């Protein structure tokens, strides 16, 4: 009988979480949702010195922002130590593990001898019990590590959903340390016990874990467990072709939020960073879940492309509700010194957002563009000298007069602009540029008629007339 699908995301809280990390949450989340299964969050925090609550919080915050909800967890490995110790005791009792007293110095010396002889460096089984074998006398006062009694013959085989059939000879594997001298279990051991206890059916993770897989399968089988389906995802590369990492300049997941990216854009981009559905580039979260499968996971490293993410973000910004974007823009406006009081004195923020969003790739850019509506203009003196010339002043005066009398609609403002151009035999930039400078303080705005309508008649006319006084 087919087991109900259960997937997991099992990060180590030892640093910030970047897009390459969170992709290993997105795919198992999507697969669990597609298969009506269960998605488990497990925090692998056995590296006590490097783990931190701050890193855990960053993981949870990033998952929440991207909408990667989990059904069980977070489950912390440090809270399962009693269970690990019980399994270690069981393995010792059943002869599946044994104490090893070889010191680190002895092991280093052994490996040096093996290298000198052209052999693969590995533990040689000195303390491994065998029928008829006489073991050395345990040294006084030395606490042993525990090693897993790996099979000496045969082959570990699994059909990886990404890499295809993988075969590793047990002769290549030495007896893995599964507990330290102080009794604390090792990562590879904890992972096996967790996956077994949590009935994980599919392990979707980075291919930096491939070398761990045959050892984990052997331990799992020794404990009577059924190996899950493995899907080892190729590395995510940065734009320079290096493995994505903090050291190589990767941004944290939340840095994308703080830069003005929308979560749906990041999810869409991440989904395509190692998986495909035909030629589809833009799709909703619901479509992604419906389409996701393991068969179309990429087999080659995926390279991050910031311009592609920005393009997707621009698409989702255009599609987003103005009120939602306005709320998201508020922190960016605050950072620009534009508070609620300033916004209250200007045009409706939703309307400003609606005008500015078609030109923006991030919410931050929307806020930067919207700021002109809530500030007293301070145009550059050189720009004023260039655009507000004696030749154009009569046209500006006529335009101000026309705008005083016009209906305050985009169409009426546009008609006033065109009539002024015709009267003074000017081209649009000759009039629009000085008007932009005087009203908005910049020559870079959306369509001039739409901008003037939002500024309002009083602000537009008074600012033009003040410059002509």
From Swiss-Prot:
UniProt EC number: 6.1.1.17
Which SUPFAM superfamilies does UniProt cross-reference here? Answer: An anticodon-binding domain of class I aminoacyl-tRNA synthetases, Nucleotidylyl transferase
Q: Which reaction does it catalyse?
A: tRNA(Glu) + L-glutamate + ATP = L-glutamyl-tRNA(Glu) + AMP + diphosphate
Q: List the disulfide bonds.
A: none
Q: Where is this motif: 'KMSKS' region?
A: 243-247
Q: Name one GO cellular component term.
A: cytosol
- Which UniProt keywords are listed? Aminoacyl-tRNA synthetase, ATP-binding, Cytoplasm, Ligase, Nucleotide-binding, Protein biosynthesis
Which of this chain's residues are annotated to bind ATP?
246
One Gene Ontology term of the molecular function aspect: glutamate-tRNA ligase activity
- Where is it localised? Cytoplasm
Where do the record's region annotations for Disordered lie? 118-138
The record's annotation in PROSITE patterns points to: AA_TRNA_LIGASE_I (PS00178)
Q: Entry's HAMAP family? A: Glu_tRNA_synth_type1
Family, per the entry?
Belongs to the class-I aminoacyl-tRNA synthetase family. Glutamate--tRNA ligase type 1 subfamily.
Q: How does it assemble?
A: Monomer.
Briefly state the protein's biological role. Answer: Catalyzes the attachment of glutamate to tRNA(Glu) in a two-step reaction: glutamate is first activated by ATP to form Glu-AMP and then transferred to the acceptor end of tRNA(Glu).
Q: What is this protein called?
A: Glutamate--tRNA ligase
Originating organism: Burkholderia vietnamiensis (strain G4 / LMG 22486) (Burkholderia cepacia (strain R1808))
